[in-house]
């Protein structure tokens, strides 16, 4: 009998009933909510006369609609209604939350790990497609729809069919200037946005082992762009060191670690599909089109038109085959989002822009992903570095990742963005998004166009 993967072990721990290959009832350890996908679910509870079964296992954040200049100046009626309704709902149903304007407020996928609620071995859901971020800690974590949010509210359970298992092994040593964002963008560019459909993706290998938790979260965050709603990594000493001392970790932390160590995938675990990628061969990645698979490394020209999707993408983006990333005339820079708005991301960008000025006629904003990150960054002077360079230093929130708040890229303008999606109109009507690492975005802010960060002395 072959060994088990970490996913197998976690799945088995959480099955309540049901046969393999059929929908199985799973117990949910942690339910994260935010203002966009929860209002109808709460109303469904009211209509049925139900309560939240485990408010102690539920945690709310305010992030998608929050303005980042004056956080309380919410002018869009729908956004204000969603913010106000969540504030009412968490009080009515007794749910702890990082309230709007509080010292813990931030993007849900940052607040969970920061507070220690995200822990190895947990089964985590949230009404948000980037919930796979939490898989970096050795959890089953994925996004759910609003009707499922209501089901979890009422029962603390969810019906799920166990997916197939894919192993993605990152090997080798990266060149300087290559980061975990490049790993995941390169994977998606090579294998496509549908490769992970129907699979849980386990990321491992020597290149993963060397990453910090913040870098690991970047990879798991974009599992959904690879087609998989779940990404997972094995917990290790890096995981435990990150978690130790955080607010919500188990009181007997050493005992918890002893249990978490048993979750690691067995050496003889079997997978339905295996992909290996040598990161030593990677160059900085930039997307040129309108889905995350439409990306190239800095050294490679944009591809020839292969199908109608390429043709439409080139038309929308105002680009053509044979051009290169350095040819893109950028107008906006966005450093933020649940993909790359952690302290280490901001430190990396600050090293590159320190003592320099952003290119004329370019707008550049930095949005810390949470208030704790903002405070930590300001404590070491990152805010001053960015502001001296000409960046706008904002309050925490989802910001320009998506057009659901005042932060939008103008129609027709190209934006270098550290976020996770480059769909048409994602950052605002007519916005042209180019996904990249924080280093690439910061360097582009200074030059006005993409440059090869491998050649910069500030890059390690």
From Swiss-Prot:
Keyword Lyase belongs to the record: yes
UniProt cofactor note: Binds 1 [4Fe-4S] cluster per subunit.
Alphabetic keyword roster: 4Fe-4S, Amino-acid biosynthesis, Branched-chain amino acid biosynthesis, Iron, Iron-sulfur, Leucine biosynthesis, Lyase, Metal-binding
Pfam family, one: Aconitase
Signal peptide, first to last residue: none
Role: Catalyzes the isomerization between 2-isopropylmalate and 3-isopropylmalate, via the formation of 2-isopropylmaleate.
Protein family according to the UniProt entry: Belongs to the aconitase/IPM isomerase family. LeuC type 1 subfamily.
Subunit and interaction comment: Heterodimer of LeuC and LeuD.
Record protein name field: 3-isopropylmalate dehydratase large subunit
């Amino acid at each position: 009998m072959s060994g088990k993967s970490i996913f197998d072990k976690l799945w088995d721990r959480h099955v309540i009933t049901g046969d393999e290959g059929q929908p199985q009832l799973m117990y949910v350890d942690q339910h994260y909510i935010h203002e966009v996908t929860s209002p109808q679910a709460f109303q469904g509870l009211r209509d049925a006369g139900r309560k939240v079964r485990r408010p102690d296992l539920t945690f709310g954040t305010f992030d998608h609609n929050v303005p980042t200049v004056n956080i309380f100046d919410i002018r869009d009626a729908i956004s204000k209604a969603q913010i106000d309704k969540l504030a009412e709902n968490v009080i009515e149903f007794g749910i702890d939350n990082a309230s709007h304007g509080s010292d813990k407020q931030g993007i849900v996928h940052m607040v969970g790990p920061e507070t220690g609620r995200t822990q190895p071995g947990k089964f985590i859901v949230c009404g948000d497609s980037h919930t796979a971020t939490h898989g970096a800690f050795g959890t089953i974590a994925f996004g759910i729809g609003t009707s499922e949010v209501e089901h979890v509210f009422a029962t603390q359970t969810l019906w799920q069919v166990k997916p197939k298992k894919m192993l993605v092994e990152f090997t080798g040593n990266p060149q300087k200037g290559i980061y975990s964002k490049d790993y995941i963008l390169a994977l998606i560019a090579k294998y496509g946005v549908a490769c992970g459909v129907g699979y849980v993706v386990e990321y491992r290998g020597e290149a993963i082992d060397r990453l910090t938790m913040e870098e690991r979260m970047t990879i798991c965050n974009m599992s959904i762009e690879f087609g998989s709603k779940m990404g997972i990594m094995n917990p290790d000493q890096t995981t435990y060191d990150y978690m130790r001392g955080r607010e919500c970790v188990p009181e007997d932390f050493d005992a918890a670690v002893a249990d978490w160590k048993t979750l690691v995938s067995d050496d003889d675990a079997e997978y339905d599909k295996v992909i290996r990628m040598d990161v030593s061969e990677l160059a900085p990645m930039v997307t040129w089109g309108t889905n995350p698979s439409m990306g190239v490394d800095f050294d490679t020209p944009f591809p020839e038109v292969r199908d109608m999707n390429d043709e439409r993408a080139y038309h929308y983006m105002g680009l053509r085959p044979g051009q290169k990333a350095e040819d893109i005339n950028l107008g906006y820079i966005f450093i933020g989002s649940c993909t790359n708005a952690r302290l280490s991301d901001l430190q990396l960008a600050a090293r590159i822009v320190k003592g320099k000025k952003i290119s004329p006629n370019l707008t550049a904003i930095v949005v810390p992903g949470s208030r704790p990150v903002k405070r930590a960054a300001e404590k070491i002077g990152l805010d001053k570095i960015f502001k001296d360079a000409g960046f706008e230093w904002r309050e925490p929130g989802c910001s320009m990742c998506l057009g659901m708040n005042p932060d939008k890229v103008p129609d027709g303008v190209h934006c270098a963005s550290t976020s996770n999606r480059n769909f048409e109109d994602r950052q605002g009507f007519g916005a042209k998004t180019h996904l990249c690492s924080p280093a690439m975005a910061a360097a582009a802010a200074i030059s006005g166009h993409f440059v090869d960060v491998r050649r910069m002395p500030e890059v390690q």
